[in-house]
Amino acid sequence: MRRFLFILLCVHFIINFQRLHAQTVTIRYTESSADFPNPERGFYIPSQTHAGNFVPLNKQQLIQYRTAQQKHGSASYAIYSTLLFRYYILDQFVHKPLSTDFLQKLDNDFTVVRDAGLKMIIRFSYINKVQANGCADKEGICPPYGDAPKTIVLQHILQLKPLLQKNADIIAVLQQGFIGIWGENYYTDYFGDASENGAGRIMDSSWRDRNDILKALLDALPKNRMVQVRTPQMKQKFVYGPVASTDSKPMSREKAYNNTDEARIGFHNDCFLASSDDYGTYYDYGSSSTPKKPANETMRKYFAADSRYGPVGGETCDDAFSPQNDCAPAGRAEEEMAAMHYSYLNTGYNNTVNNDWDSAGCMSSIKKRLGYRFVLKDAHFPAAGKAGEPFAFSVNLSNKGFASPFNPRTVELVLRNTESGKIFILPCKTDIRFWFSGDIQWKETEALPDTIAAGSYALLLNFPDQYPSLSERPEYSIQLANENVWEAGTGYNKLNHIVMIGNEND
């Protein structure tokens, strides 16, 4: 009799499990309005040091940037920051190789940033100051400017390559730099001076020299890291050659994130909404056969289309373009950030502009929307599953940010046993670099591990850094903008669903 009852109970359990296995559960989520730090996005902290007077980074100070919301410099608004912009001014090395001492100090900086849980936006330049001596330039910036010749720049990039490769995990993006004052590729002694002091245009030979520098920088980085150029025309001239026209085609979705040179070039605009063309950002600087001339509308269209698939950031530089650079309805600050897919801006400059966003009421939104901001809406999961069998699910999200993540990132569905805490991870196929602004419908089917034991499992989402050195550090994982989902200790996002797992005999 007991044996008969036992068999009945087993049959009952199997039937119930099979019913559960066929059921799908819908979970709905509540959006959070909180401002919180996330990797590789937001307002950055500016920092610079000269090779001739190297000031190293401070770990505790960097940790404070990430963990404590605070105001910086003349800013009226407080921020969390996971990004450090670091200027390395190679003032001692304009005509000679980088020293072993400088390279060691640079490597030490990388270690400090990694230990503090931040990432870096890096630019190298040779000169960050100007001289005026009555020259022709309307801005009063006069030659000699003080940057380095091509042979020296290429030598320095080769010296930097081992460190850039070694520390790519904490490099969010590298800016082209090197050429001209501030590394902005305009006022230069050696790469074609397009100002009134020079030819008033950039000749074909100078475009080729600039392209050689950009190519060397791309080669100095791993294929999974990108270089930002100062103007969209710089990318056109690199991709299509010195004679490229301003109506050259932007990158397509099919080419995006395929590790080619074209797919690894983004933009930094250091005069965001400073004028109708952002002080020459959207300009045609000419060639040997064409003059320098305005190209605002054409270059804006190119920038908007191409920037969907790469890193965009920069800073404001002048408040002369008010009210256009203000909050809506008088201005179009957020509209422009969305159209051009901004992931980051400078909190240190220019706060004459930035503070207006704070006083007018749109800074709170900008802080949350720079880069990505993923919000769970609802999800559909099986009530039960079996070891080794397919596990199909769907998740509906929204990206409320201006852009998608620009560096590759792992996505994991985590199953955590509710009793033992043991973790099983399902690597997912989705690429969140294509999770653009707006609604996202994500559907996948993954096989449950053969080794997963029967029991109840909590489901969680994890978006860890792709580098093993950072993948288990929660400060480098993406937090979703929902109430009651984030686990600060693990970097996981709770999906608020328990799934029953059976074995192959159930």
Question: Over which residues does each language-model region extend?
Answer:
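Catalytic cores of secreted or luminal carbohydrate-active enzymes
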Residues: 327-381
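The substrate-binding groove and active-site-proximal loops of carbohydrate-active enzymes
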Residues: 89-101, 139-151, 193-207
